[in-house]
Amino acid sequence: MNGGHIQLIIGPMFSGKSTELIRRVRRYQIAQYKCVTIKYSNDNRYGTGLWTHDKNNFEALEATKLCDVLESITDFSVIGIDEGQFFPDIVEFCERMANEGKIVIVAALDGTFQRKPFNNILNLIPLSEMVVKLTAVCMKCFKEASFSKRLGEETEIEIIGGNDMYQSVCRKCYIDS
């Protein structure tokens, strides 16, 4: 076995996916692994680099397709990917990198605001050695929240925003609103 594998961190908005991604990448950095992080370039809410909702920043390459950064990451053994649901080539890229012996850590929304699978991110589950589904706190009743609820009436899937546009909600609050 070449040591390559895929770790998938999924959950709703505000569940700490990016924070967990950064924690895992930092852990490998401490162990002297050569690490790189990639973020979706259309997510420019807070500036350059990878940002968490609580304003923690981490250096990251930016791309709209992962294949565009292939040449830049050949020397790295750990690849962190934030907002994985937005990359159209996420499944093929992760499988290729893991097969080449790299550790790939992906943070992604598992469902849309309509509680549908988010693009093809769920296709990574059978290819992953480790899958963690995080929960948030329901912003209405303060129970465990597994879903992201959009506050506006827009119907397109890819609308990037924070707590001005989305809430994490439990099942009951999702259905009631």
UniProtKB/Swiss-Prot annotation:
Keyword terms, alphabetized: ATP-binding, Disulfide bond, DNA synthesis, Kinase, Metal-binding, Nucleotide-binding, Transferase, Zinc
Listed GO MF terms: ATP binding; metal ion binding; thymidine kinase activity
EC category name: transferase
UniProt-listed PROSITE patterns: TK_CELLULAR_TYPE
Binding site for substrate: F113, I157, E158, I159, I160, G161
EC number: 2.7.1.21
Catalysed reactions, as listed in the record: thymidine + ATP = dTMP + ADP + H(+)
Active-site residues, record numbering mapped to chain: E83
Residues the entry annotates as binding Zn(2+): C138, C141, C170, C173
Positions annotated to bind ATP: G11, P12, M13, F14, S15, G16, K17, S18
Any single GO BP term: DNA biosynthetic process
Function recorded in the entry: Phosphorylates thymidine and thymidine analogs, such as azidothymidine (AZT). Part of the salvage pathway for pyrimidine deoxyribonucleotide synthesis.
Quaternary structure note: Homotetramer. Two molecules of substrate bind to each enzyme tetramer.
Family: Belongs to the thymidine kinase family.
Name of the protein in question: Thymidine kinase
Organism: Vaccinia virus (strain Western Reserve) (VACV)
